[in-house]
């Protein structure tokens, strides 16, 4: 009997506990839903309350390892108008698309229709399946009247929308940023120092600052451009024993530490001898060894010699003494196999599937990394193309492509050329 009584008491207690838990759960769910709905409404209200819009310092790459960008956005009636300093956008360009604020993971701000100024940082390309790892959906984590704190839904970078003052002109502001971008060089050093710890490297296309620690380790930090200079994201740059978060950029491109303007850095250009030697040329599908040497009696001309498929080829490279960079142009070269009268080493835009035939790629020296990176030289920009690839086509002696079964014959294929690294 005693055992039966204990069992009944336990059963009643369990039922009572379940009932209480059930009541609490219903109460919590209801209040949480109300709170989220209220936050959603408040987020949209605050977004559309700014007459001159919001500024967003936007970061790509997981853990903010990519570049930093500035976007200006005006929200109204479910639409958002965007301008920005990304390479794809002119300071005067504006693109309008739609946006939503929903409660899928708490309040989520979503740019739910395509905006070419904003979305391209997250778009996949042939070379990068995840693009630049950019978000266009953001979990709202905190709201004030002048700031909206968000976290990227996919890449989880923390960012802040800040209210733009009513008297700030968007075009003038973005033009000031663009002017700073144009003044940025690549290789900087304190004085004439050859000490790597007194040098930095600016990679404007990736928005990265590279520096070296005393032990030789390379440190890579993202930055965004301001109207007066550049701001290092995450950690300050350590340079000659000084920590620098912000660099000012002078009209002549000289860098100075914002908090210590006596610390200045000037650009330097590598000499032609920097390029002489043995290198590894890397592209998407692999790499090959290439030897670079001077061309006799030809000032600022170099020759690249490499072997592939059992044959040794020679290509021409132009040296620019002002920048210290090389240029790989589209050119006719000899076919060492004697199968064809000539080969046309032709530049191409692989992203658009276009053979171009004029222009080429610069090989930009990066002093901290001690490598040369391939970049489009801008020749075909007015056609809407970007050179990222070189292909050698079989040709007649007059430069006319030879075909087989109505297709061009590709002898050399360098897809998405990446860099030159020194062989040790």
Locate predicted features.
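C-terminal motif of bacterial Sec signal peptides marking the signal peptidase cleavage site
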Residues: 15-19
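Sec-dependent signal peptide recognition
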Residues: 2-10
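An anionic, turn-rich surface loop/hairpin at beta-sheet edges
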Residues: 110-133, 229-242, 334-357
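C-terminal structured domain segments
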Residues: 339-403
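Preference for solvent-exposed, low-hydrophobicity sequence contexts
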Residues: 158, 164-282, 293-297, 305, ...
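N-terminal glycine/threonine-rich, aromatic-flanked beta-hairpin/loop signature
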Residues: 61-106, 194-231, 285-332
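Long, acidic/polar, low-complexity amphipathic helices and coiled-coil-like
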Residues: 79-220
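Acidic/polar, low-complexity intrinsically disordered N-terminal segments immediately downstream
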Residues: 21-108, 143, 166-190, 414-423
């Amino acid at each position: 009997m005693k055992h039966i009584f204990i069992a009944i008491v336990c059963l009643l207690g369990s039922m009572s506990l379940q009932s209480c838990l059930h009541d609490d759960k219903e109460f919590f769910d209801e209040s949480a839903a109300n709170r989220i709905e209220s936050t959603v409404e408040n987020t949209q209200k605050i977004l559309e309350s700014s007459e001159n819009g919001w500024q967003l310092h936007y970061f790509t790459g997981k853990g903010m390892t990519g570049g930093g960008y500035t976007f200006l956005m005006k929200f109204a009636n479910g639409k958002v108008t965007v301008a920005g300093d990304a390479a794809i956008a002119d300071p005067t360009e504006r693109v309008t698309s739609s946006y939503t604020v929903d409660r899928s993971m708490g309040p989520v701000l979503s740019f739910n229709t395509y905006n070419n100024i904003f979305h391209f940082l997250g778009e996949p390309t042939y070379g990068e399946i995840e693009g630049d790892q950019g978000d266009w959906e953001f979990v709202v984590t905190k709201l004030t009247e002048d700031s909206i704190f968000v976290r990227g839904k996919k890449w989880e970078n923390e960012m802040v929308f800040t209210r733009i003052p009513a008297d700030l002109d968007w075009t003038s502001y973005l033009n000031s940023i663009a002017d700073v971008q144009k003044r940025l060089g690549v290789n900087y050093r304190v004085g004439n120092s050859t000490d790597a710890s007194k040098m930095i490297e600016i990679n404007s296309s990736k928005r990265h600052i590279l520096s070296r620690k005393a032990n030789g380790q390379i440190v890579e930090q993202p930055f965004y451009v301001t109207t007066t200079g550049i701001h290092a994201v995450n950690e300050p740059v350590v340079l000659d024993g000084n920590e620098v978060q912000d660099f000012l950029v002078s009209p002549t491109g000289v860098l100075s530490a914002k908090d210590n303007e006596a610390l200045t850095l000037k650009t330097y250009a590598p000499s032609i001898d920097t390029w002489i030697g043995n290198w590894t040329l890397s592209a998407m599908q692999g790499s090959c060894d290439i030897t670079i040497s001077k061309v006799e009696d030809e000032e600022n001309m170099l020759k690249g010699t490499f072997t592939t498929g059992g044959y040794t080829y020679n290509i021409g490279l132009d040296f620019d003494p002002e920048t210290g960079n090389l240029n790989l142009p589209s050119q006719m070269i000899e076919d060492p196999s004697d199968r064809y009268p000539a080969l046309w080493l032709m530049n191409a835009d692989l992203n658009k599937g276009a053979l171009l035939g004029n222009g080429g790629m610069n090989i930009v020296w990066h002093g901290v990394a001690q490598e040369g990176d391939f970049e489009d030289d801008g020749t075909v920009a007015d056609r809407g193309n970007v050179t990222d690839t070189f292909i050698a086509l079989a040709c007649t002696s007059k430069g006319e492509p030879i075909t087989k079964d109505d297709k061009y014959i590709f002898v050399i294929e360098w897809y998405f050329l990446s860099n030159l690294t020194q062989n040790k």
